[in-house]
């Protein structure tokens, strides 16, 4: 029972931060959204809102990391795979009324210079996405340096395009980023997927078609 209450709190906190960021979310908001009394929040998270946010962001980051591989797994052409990631992200954003923003990205810029615990947490999530994505693309047959470059460019382009898409209420930023990023990699083969990699983006990112 304690675990389900804890998970309900983290899920509610992540969902609230996805829509509102960190500063606009209060403990009463989390209690109301999770169905847990305020006392339960402090029982499970004596560190209060910062501790809840940190745990929620790490949990959400692990879930979002599974999204990119979920799209890429079935593709054998890197360019087509990258285009598919952005197309799926655009579909997800439009389908949620441009509200499907990753909580990690929503909070990261907001707290980077003000709350060190959360800066470290979001930095850790991004690092996991980049390292996991690099390992994933290496497993799919890309040279190490290319795998890293593709992952960094993919995550960076997605995060930036999500912000523009949400602000403009338009999928154009995602579709344009997908066209430009995928074009140089058309015809680049991806090796068949053999085994899953724990922590690989798309298996951690929130991310990333993590319509963040």
Explain the meaning of each model-derived region.
Residues 103-106, 145-164, 176, 180-184:
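Hydrophobic alpha-helical segments that form the core
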Residues 68-100, 139, 150-154:
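Hydrophobic alpha-helical connector segments
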Residues 8, 12-55:
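Helix-turn-helix
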């Amino acid at each position: 029972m304690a675990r389900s209450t804890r998970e309900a709190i983290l899920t509610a906190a992540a969902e609230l931060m996805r829509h509102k960021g960190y500063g606009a979310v209060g403990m009463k908001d989390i209690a109301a959204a999770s169905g847990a009394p305020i006392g339960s929040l402090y029982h499970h998270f004596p560190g209060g809102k910062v501790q809840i946010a940190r745990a929620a962001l790490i949990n959400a980051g692990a879930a979002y990391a599974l999204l990119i591989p979920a799209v890429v797994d079935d593709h054998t052409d890197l360019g087509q795979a990258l285009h598919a990631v952005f197309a799926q992200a655009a579909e997800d954003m439009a389908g949620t009324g441009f509200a499907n923003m990753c909580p990690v990205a929503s909070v990261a810029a907001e707290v980077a210079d003000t709350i060190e615990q959360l800066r470290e947490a979001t930095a850790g999530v991004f690092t996991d996405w980049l390292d996991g994505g690099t390992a994933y693309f290496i497993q799919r047959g890309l040279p190490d340096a290319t795998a890293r470059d593709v992952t960094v460019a993919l995550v960076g382009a997605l995060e930036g395009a999500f912000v523009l898409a949400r602000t403009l209420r338009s999928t154009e930023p995602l579709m344009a980023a997908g066209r430009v990023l995928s074009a140089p990699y058309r015809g680049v083969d991806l090796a068949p997927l053999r085994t899953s990699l724990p922590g690989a983006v798309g298996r951690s990112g929130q991310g990333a078609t993590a319509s963040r």
